[in-house]
Swiss-Prot record:
Optimum pH is 4.5. Has an extremely wide pH stability range (4.0-13.0). The lineage of its organism: Bacteria, Bacillati, Bacillota, Bacilli, Bacillales. Its EC number is 3.2.1.14. Residues 95-180 form the Fibronectin type-III domain. This is Chitinase Chi52. Optimum temperature is 65 degrees Celsius. Stable up to 50 degrees Celsius. Residues 1-30 form the signal peptide. Acidic chitinase that displays a broad substrate specificity, showing the highest specific activity toward colloidal chitin, followed by ethylene glycol chitin and ball milled chitin, but exhibits no activity toward powdery chitin and chitosan. Hydrolyzes colloidal chitin and chitooligosaccharides with degree of polymerization 2-5 to release mainly N-acetyl chitobiose. Displays inhibition effects on the growth of some phytopathogenic fungi, including Alternaria alstroemeriae, Botrytis cinerea, Rhizoctonia solani, Sclerotinia sclerotiorum and Valsa mali. It comes from Paenibacillus xylanexedens. It comes from the Bacteria. Pfam families: CBM_5_12, fn3, Glyco_hydro_18.
Length: 523
């Protein structure tokens, strides 16, 4: 008898058995579950919501940057490798740690904490005041409002995941609100912010310590990349030694002034297109700020530094790498220096209010940055110059350099607006104390947008006190916004060029507003 025929059934059965155990055996190459707080490198595989993703850019995972919503960081590669039937998620996230408070006023407090971890992913956090849920957030920060002056509250935070599992409460944090009488600003409740040139452009050469005492916040301009395409920023004083410049900063700070490092400018293109450049950015800024003792950082990116890639259509979840990396980098710098570190930004109108009608390229490109940093942002002073005309919330176009322009552009940030048209996602308003008006100090300072002191002050009287000047634009909030912070100008040097006419006109005006408005936010 043929031996091959005799043993064929045995061989067939053995082969079938081998195929069965291979099919049902656990896969050795199954991807690990994605977790917030984990450092991933390019090529790492993870599973999230039963789908597999490959890391395409090294980063540390954060809540809100899950693989399914950040294609700039993750590439979908197939259905989940964890098995045919996923195991139900019953494990709660870890307990939030490091709960701290900052920016305590008589009616509000800012809270922050360390990110929790979870076997699948943290979906968000719940904030409790005296044991009662007061707000939920997808980030590790929250602002609790509606508090009473001179009152002590106990705050806790719980983490939750997509399956509904909730962690135990964090360690309780006791916070006592202020009595409302503290001095909030460097010298008053209304600030005058100016940019100081670290270069000579024919305006005026001023030692930093000799800046007019009218200014509350001085933005030293600029830190710039060491070379084209680099993420490493550098700063060297142009008219003083390092020791002299550090002494000048300390001198201004002894007078109650805040001295910030401004990065970028018209010539300082900063494009953080990958994780390496982002790390260079973080490391170099931390070094510069620590060396000189700056009080904070100002973001003054223009041109191609911020531009939306094709297909990046929602400011709430950006996909353009240089925008994603900028957000992560600035958050890291802010976190490194703590709650008292000031963060400001000076975008052009096209990059902010321009997103009202169109979102793409430069139009609205700052909105994802402002949105992601709104809890960290001390002040936003959009440049109301070099812009031409812009459309307000009423659908009408207003020309730069007029009172109507300033009122219309400011109220867009105070009311919020739909992005990219009336059906687009809504950009929520900022707090009034986060807003200042940016204008040129003289006609020589900008290509357009200079506003006379009389026109700027009547715009501010309307915006802050609701005192109408009979213009074409009508405030949606007729009583105004008392908390608006003040005026920013380009620049201190151009102001000095005209014998400080700008600051001499506006400092007394701001002082007058300071005596009429109270209960501002403390920084």
């Amino acid at each position: 008898m043929n031996q091959a025929v005799r043993f064929r059934p045995v061989i067939t059965f053995a082969l079938a058995f081998l195929l069965l155990i291979t099919w049902f055996a656990p896969r050795a190459d199954a991807a690990a579950q994605w977790q917030a707080g984990t450092a991933y490198k390019k090529g790492d595989l993870v599973t999230y919501q039963n789908k597999d993703y490959e890391c395409i850019q090294a980063h540390t995972a954060l809540t809100g940057w899950e693989p399914s919503v950040v294609p700039a960081l993750w590439k979908y590669v197939g259905e989940g490798s964890g098995g045919e039937t996923p195991t139900p998620d019953t494990a709660p996230p870890s307990v939030p740690a490091g709960l701290t408070s900052s920016s305590i006023t008589d009616t509000s407090v800012s809270l922050s904490w360390n990110a929790s971890t979870d076997n699948v992913g943290v979906a968000g956090y719940e904030v409790y005041r005296n044991g009662v849920l007061v707000t939920s957030t997808s980030t590790t920060t929250a602002v609790v409002t509606g508090l009473t002056a001179s009152t002590t509250y106990a705050f806790t935070v719980k983490a939750k995941d997509a399956a509904g599992n909730i962690s135990a409460a964090s360690t309780s944090l006791s916070v006592t609100t202020s009595n409302g009488s503290s001095n909030p600003g460097p010298t008053g409740t209304k600030w005058l912010i100016g940019y100081w040139h670290n270069f000579d452009n024919g305006s005026t050469n001023i030692r930093l310590r000799n800046v007019s005492t009218a200014y509350d916040v001085i933005n030293v301009s600029f830190a710039e990349p060491i070379s084209h395409g680099s993420g490493t920023l550098a700063f060297t004083p142009y008219n003083a030694t390092v020791a002299e410049f550090k002494s000048d900063i300390a001198y201004l700070q002894s007078q109650g002034k805040k001295v910030l490092l401004s990065m970028g400018g018209a010539n300082g293109t900063i494009e953080l297109t990958d994780a390496t450049k982002r790390q260079q950015f973080e490391d170099s800024l931390k070094s510069i700020i620590s060396t000189y003792g700056f009080n904070g950082l100002d973001i003054d990116l223009e041109g191609s530094s911020l531009s939306l890639n094709a297909g990046d259509t929602d400011f709430r979840s950006p996909t353009t790498p240089k925008i994603v990396n900028l957000i992560q980098g600035v958050k890291a710098v802010k976190s490194h220096f703590g709650a008292n570190f000031i963060l400001t930004a000076a975008p052009e109108t096209a990059y902010v209010q321009g997103g009202y009608l169109s979102y793409g390229g430069p139009w609205g490109a700052y909105l994802p940055v402002i949105h992601a940093l709104r809890n960290e942002l001390t002040l936003l002073h959009v440049q109301h110059y070099n812009t031409g005309s812009m459309v307000g919330l009423d659908g009408r176009s207003y020309a730069q350099g007029t009172a109507d322009f300033h009122v219309a552009m400011a109220e867009m940030l105070l009311q919020g607006f739909h992005v990219g048209g009336s059906t687009g996602p809504f950009f929520s308003p900022l707090r009034p104390d986060q807003i200042a008006i940016g204008v040129p100090a003289s006609q020589q300072a900008a290509g357009g947008g200079y506003t006379t002191p009389a026109d700027l002050q009547k715009a501010l009287n309307y915006l802050i006190k609701g005192v109408s000047y009979g213009g074409s634009y009508t405030l949606r909030q007729s009583t105004g916004y008392a908390g608006i912070k003040g005026i920013m100008t380009w620049s201190i040097n151009w102001d000095a060029y005209t014998n400080n006419q700008f600051s001499s006109a506006h400092r007394p005006f701001l002082n007058g507003l300071s005596t009429q408005t109270t209960k501002e936010v403390v920084y």
